[in-house]
């Protein structure tokens, strides 16, 4: 006959007492808040006036790419933000940081554990076998006497916030890169089209020169000059084709596609966008902007640097607190009710108490505290550097926008004059007044002026995008899916 022996038994009352014990221990937390360092923003030398500043209207830049009123660009940006690998990696990093923050926060509360066991004993003399069952519920808790646990929680939370801003910074960069590639493809398509027209025009020039040579009107040198000009244009045309291929491949990578895929035909959403064949002939959005310091604080890289600074300060506090005595309380529930009463009457005496005295490791403590302080000072320098770089980015972007606009006006005048000179030389050559080289040179000058004007148009668009990115703006990153 088998006999069952229960070494541990829990009643509902016992479980309630155990839960009450855990809650009581939790009230001991927070005793070390007095050891936290107060955050003081680093001193910054911010200029009273900017070199390139006009103050007229409130800046609104989000979503800034829509200010160009190009539906195909809007569609492309949306697709990149939903498929790009860099943004996916940044999202995974953010999720990991948030999970780590949650794990750290759990250290504030008592940790419960339970185990069940069973054994069977069979006497060698053939007597009755016995079975026994064991059940234990234990509680462990580190009292946050000096704020170490709280500092670790702060460090993890600030790190998670910094990770969120890193993701937003990745988003801002992706949008700017997408817009730049979109316009670059349009610019190169337009250059390729102009190049094809110029080659066809050069062929006509060569044919005309050949006929004149055959009739004895010009020398062979004129024919060779026309051939040289056409060969140079064909070589330049090949280079443009290569640049266009590189731009399309770069866009395919942004869209999470293999290189050589046609971005216009294989969007993951099933939509298609019409590849831009020329730069948009619309006015570049005008942003009249004063740049106060608080405007740049919204930039994700600046916010991330600030959060990293706060995280470093909390880490410094945690390192400092880790060398103060730490008190760990452990208790087990599974005995008689009288033992539970004793535990609640005198918790520190009844619970297992482990007192660790790390401050005895004096040399190691000093070194680790110095390392933590250096990490904090490094974060201060990085924050100051990031903010100053933000001011530099905006100042440079405003200057570039202004100078490209000025250059555009002058290049338009240059193209107009070059086209007029070409027409005059063509007429003179056809009438036999000048040699073919003068006409060929005029053609080259006109082509160069037209290419420079087109490139300036591309530069104005990208400079505007760079300014929008430098200003930061509100968050544009896609929201995270619910965990």
Residue ranges and their predicted role:
Residues 133-139, 291, 349-355:
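Hydrophobic, lipid-facing positions within transmembrane beta-strands of outer-membrane proteins
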Residues 89-104, 170, 174-197, 201-206, ...:
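Amphipathic alpha-helical coiled-coil segments
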Residues 71-117, 131, 138, 142, ...:
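Intrinsically disordered, glycine/charged-rich N-terminal periplasmic/extracytoplasmic linker segments
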Residues 2-6, 15-19, 25-82, 157, ...:
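Terminal intrinsically disordered/low-complexity segments used for targeting and assembly
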Residues 240, 300-301, 307, 456:
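Metallo-beta-lactamase
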Residues 108-130, 140-169, 188-191, 267-269, ...:
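Small/polar (Gly/Ser/Thr/Ala-rich) solvent-exposed segments
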Residues 73-75, 132-134, 180, 225, ...:
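Transmembrane beta-barrel architecture of outer-membrane proteins
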Residues 214-243:
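Repeat-solenoid scaffold signature
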């Amino acid at each position: 006959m088998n006999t069952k022996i229960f070494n541990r038994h829990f009643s509902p009352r016992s479980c309630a007492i155990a839960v009450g014990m855990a809650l009581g221990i939790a009230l001991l937390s927070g005793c070390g808040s007095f050891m936290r360092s107060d955050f003081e923003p680093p001193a910054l030398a911010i200029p009273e006036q900017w070199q390139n500043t006009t103050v007229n209207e409130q800046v609104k830049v989000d979503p800034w790419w829509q200010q160009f009123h190009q539906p195909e660009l809007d569609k492309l940006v949306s697709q990149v933000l939903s498929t790009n690998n860099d943004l996916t990696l940044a999202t995974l990093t953010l999720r990991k940081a948030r999970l780590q923050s949650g794990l750290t926060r759990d250290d504030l509360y008592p940790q419960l554990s339970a185990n069940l066991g069973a054994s069977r004993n069979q006497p060698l003399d053939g007597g009755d076998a016995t079975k026994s069952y064991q059940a234990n519920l234990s509680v462990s808790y580190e009292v946050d006497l000096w704020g170490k646990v709280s500092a670790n929680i702060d460090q993890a939370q600030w790190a998670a916030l910094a990770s969120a801003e890193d993701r937003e910074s990745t988003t801002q960069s992706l949008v700017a890169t997408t817009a730049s590639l979109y316009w670059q493809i349009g610019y190169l398509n337009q250059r390729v089209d102009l190049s094809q027209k110029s080659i066809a025009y050069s062929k006509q020039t060569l044919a005309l020169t050949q006929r004149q040579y055959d009739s004895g009107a010009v020398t062979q040198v004129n024919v060779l000059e026309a051939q040289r000009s056409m060969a140079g244009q064909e070589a330049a045309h090949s280079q443009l084709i290569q640049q266009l291929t590189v731009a399309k491949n770069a866009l395919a990578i942004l869209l999470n596609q293999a290189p050589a895929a046609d971005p216009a035909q294989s969007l993951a959403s099933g939509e298609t966008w019409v590849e831009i064949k020329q730069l948009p002939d619309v006015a570049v959005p005008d942003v009249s902007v004063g740049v106060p310091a608080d405007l740049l604080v919204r930039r994700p890289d600046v916010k991330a640097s600030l959060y990293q600074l706060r995280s470093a300060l909390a880490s410094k506090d945690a390192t400092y607190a880790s060398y103060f005595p730490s008190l760990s309380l452990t208790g087990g529930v599974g005995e008689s009710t009288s033992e539970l009463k004793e535990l609640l009457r005198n918790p520190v005496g009844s619970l297992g108490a482990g007192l660790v005295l790390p401050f005895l490791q004096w040399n190691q403590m000093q070194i680790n505290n110095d390392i933590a302080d250096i990490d904090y000072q490094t974060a201060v320098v990085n924050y100051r550097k990031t903010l100053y770089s933000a001011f530099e980015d905006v100042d440079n972007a405003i200057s570039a926008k202004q100078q490209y606009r000025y250059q555009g006006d002058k290049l338009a005048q240059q193209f107009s004059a070059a086209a007029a000179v070409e027409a005059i030389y063509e007429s003179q050559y056809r009438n036999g007044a000048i040699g073919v080289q003068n006409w060929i040179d005029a053609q080259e000058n006109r082509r160069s002026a037209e290419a420079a004007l087109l490139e300036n148009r591309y530069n104005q668009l990208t400079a505007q995008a760079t300014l929008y990115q430098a200003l930061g703006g509100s968050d544009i990153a896609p929201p995270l899916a619910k965990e």
